[in-house]
Amino acid sequence: MVKVGIVGGTGYTGVEFLRLLAQHPQAEVVVITSRSEAGLAVADMYPNLRGHYDGLAFSVPDISTLGACDVVFFATPHGVAHALAGELLAAGTKVIDLSADFRLQDADEWAKWYGQPHGAPELLEEAVYGLPEVNREQIKQARLIAVPGCYPTATQLGFLPLLEAGLADVSRLIADCKSGVSGAGRGAAVGSLYSETSESMKAYAVKGHRHLPEIRQGLRRAAGQDVGLTFVPHLTPMIRGIHSTLYATVVDRSVDLQALFEKRYANEPFVDVMPAGSHPETRSVRGANVCRIAVHRPQDGDLVVVLSVIDNLVKGASGQAVQNMNILFGLDEKLGLSHAGMLP
């Protein structure tokens, strides 16, 4: 049984960890922290978890307690894992971080986008980027895993087959992405209020979103060269979901793109390449650790359109983190993650 600690248990990704791990036969949550809710029973904050965590309460983060865990998940804002990851690694505890703290390889690039110096640059070289469909072998040997962001997960999985095969003009890639409001977190903010988001949709951060350098870094690895990427995120009136509409120009029209995508993801348990002509819906992946993809070539031209959908809290966050944990500890990758999406 893998002993699990969670730092930052009161946000949406924290409670999603609890939901997923409640169904995991080989993992037990033994510590969950929250400075603001210390002493409060988990089941009192989250009634949906009654009967699953009745003996578990939030506590103040303590290195000695967390260091007794086999793995600690960080479901925290950026900067928190910087301060604690080194001590936990020294104690022999594995660290899986959902924040952006260890996703970028360049400390200066991180500081540019997050507005503060990187707090643990000595750990960047060791950190493994936790996209299993790319780095599964490295994840098996990792001590520190940086779980990809939600937009980067949907976007990279959609573009990867084209870039790995050298079929796309990488100088002009476009990612037009839509997100549900849970991606903004649980904190109170005017832009996330029901009356602000309901019956409306808007683009934001067009000049540059923090996920842009992460996406470019992953696509550059896949292509083996620098890429030109325009990334435009949008906020939509739904709670969960990412829908990425991706555009690329192909350099060889003779390739069967449907077969290319099906072959690339044939052995990936959490990527579903839909039949030709399909249009994946975000509701089809709600609550599931699945990226559902469809590839199109309108009018048989040289423009490829890839549609990629995920649940931002599952394959875009906590589910992907549990997938990484399963790989890291030599478990069946699908443990605790095999449930289907919820409909309607």
From Swiss-Prot:
E.C. no: 1.2.1.38
Active site positions: 150
SUPFAM superfamilies: Glyceraldehyde-3-phosphate dehydrogenase-like, C-terminal domain, NAD(P)-binding Rossmann-fold domains
EC class of the enzyme, as a word: oxidoreductase
Disulfide-linked positions: none
GO BP annotations listed: L-arginine biosynthetic process
Gene Ontology annotations for the cellular component aspect, listed alphabetically: cytoplasm
Main location group: cytoplasm
Localization annotation: Cytoplasm
Record pathway: Amino-acid biosynthesis; L-arginine biosynthesis; N(2)-acetyl-L-ornithine from L-glutamate: step 3/4
Domain of life: Bacteria
One Pfam family of this chain: Semialdhyde_dh
Keywords: Amino-acid biosynthesis, Arginine biosynthesis, Cytoplasm, NADP, Oxidoreductase
Record-linked Gene3D superfamilies: Dihydrodipicolinate Reductase, domain 2 (3.30.360.10), NAD(P)-binding Rossmann-like Domain (3.40.50.720)
Catalytic activity: N-acetyl-L-glutamate 5-semialdehyde + phosphate + NADP(+) = N-acetyl-L-glutamyl 5-phosphate + NADPH + H(+)
Task performed by this protein: Catalyzes the NADPH-dependent reduction of N-acetyl-5-glutamyl phosphate to yield N-acetyl-L-glutamate 5-semialdehyde.
The family this protein is said to belong to: Belongs to the NAGSA dehydrogenase family. Type 1 subfamily.
NCBIfam families for this protein: argC (TIGR01850)
Protein name from the UniProt record: N-acetyl-gamma-glutamyl-phosphate reductase
Gene for this chain: argC
